[in-house]
A protein has these predicted regions:
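Hydrophobic alpha-helical transmembrane segments of multi-pass membrane transport proteins
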Residues: 226-237
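Membrane-embedded alpha-helical bundles of polytopic integral membrane proteins
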Residues: 2-226
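Final/C-terminal transmembrane alpha-helix of multipass membrane proteins
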Residues: 263-279
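Divalent-cation-assisted or electrostatically stabilized phosphate/pyrophosphate-binding catalytic cores
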Residues: 187-194, 252-267
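Juxtamembrane boundary at the C-terminal end of a transmembrane helix
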Residues: 278-293
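Interfacial helix-loop-helix junctions of multi-pass membrane proteins
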Residues: 237-253
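Juxtamembrane/transmembrane-helix interface segments of polytopic membrane transporters
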Residues: 204, 208, 274-278, 282
Length: 293
């Protein structure tokens, strides 16, 4: 007869996956509409969302690097990002960009000179995080600063990246097949990558059709494919970073998702690419928020 204290057998892998999926869906159902509302409202609501997101990402990044946020070397990262963000909000975008390498160097030097630093702490990665997170933060602010075109551009990028992520996850689960990069992320498949790319293009076309009746759909499809590819690359990059630090998630902040960094890795890569596209395309339409001509 089994003892009362005997442990229950572990849940089957499939049951665990469905529990995780329910958690992911619930978290997305709460956070997604809040993010979209802040994007739509713009102004202080949007700036507050970006500031809060950057602060959380800085905290997660410092912990990934094996440092404490409350000690000065770790505090240098959010301070550098805060200074760069203030410059971006004030439309001093060149200054905001210049503050990133300066902040990265300051964070790295501060960490290296700290006698209390843990032996395994990574000082170079600490500085790299300032640029990695800061570029996306500046991009979010710059791209949204043009009223209607900025709103459309941010919605386009966010929805395309979300579609890429969801499409890759669902198609990869249903179809499976050859692995995309088994040494970096064993669960990602080529079928998932292609499914994510197709979803990104379809959603991009839908957003463009809603926002601009004169949009050239071929151009929109190419831009959506580029952003979807950038998002997938950002996902792989974050997987490689977590593998380097031997962690599964950047934090446990979001149930079913891990940390904020785990959820916005695609956006961190796609936003700078979108800004580069907007710089080129916007010059043809007299505004920096346009992603297509």
């Amino acid at each position: 007869m089994a003892h009362a204290s005997a442990e229950l057998p572990p849940a089957p892998p499939e049951a665990k996956r469905w529990r995780d999926l329910r958690k992911r869906a619930l978290s997305a159902a709460v956070l997604g509409p809040l993010a979209l509302a802040a994007i739509w409202l713009g102004a202080h609501w949007y700036t507050l969302m970006i500031a809060l997101g950057i602060a959380i990402l800085a905290w997660e990044w410092v912990h990934l690097c094996g440092l404490r946020v409350r000690a000065f070397p770790g505090l240098a990262v959010p301070l550098a990002l805060f200074a760069s963000g203030l410059a971006a909000v004030a439309d001093l975008h060149l200054l905001a960009l210049l503050l990133l390498p300066a902040g990265a160097a300051a964070a790295t030097l501060a960490a290296r000179s700290d006698p209390r630093r843990a032996p395994g702490a990574s000082t170079l990665w600490l500085g790299a995080g300032v640029v990695y997170i800061g570029l996306a933060g500046i991009g979010f602010i710059w791209l949204r600063s043009d009223s209607f075109a900025g709103l459309v551009a941010i919605l386009f990028v966010v929805l395309v990246v979300w579609a890429s992520d969801i499409g890759a996850y669902m198609v990869g689960r249903m179809v499976g097949g050859p692995k995309l990069a088994p040494a970096i992320s064993p669960n990602k498949t080529w079928s998932g990558a292609l499914g994510g790319l197709a979803a990104a293009v379809l959603v991009g076309l839908a957003v463009a059709a809603w926002a601009d009746a004169e949009a050239r759909l071929a151009s929109v499809a190419v831009i959506a494919a580029i952003l979807g590819t950038a998002a997938a690359a950002g996902d792989l990059l974050e997987s490689a970073i977590k593998r380097h630090f031997h962690v599964k998630d950047s934090s446990g902040l979001i149930p079913g998702h891990g940390g904020l960094l785990d959820r916005v890795d695609g956006l961190l890569a796609a936003i700078p690419v979108a800004c580069a596209i907007a710089l080129v395309q916007g010059s043809a339409r007299g505004g920096h928020g346009f992603l297509w001509t």
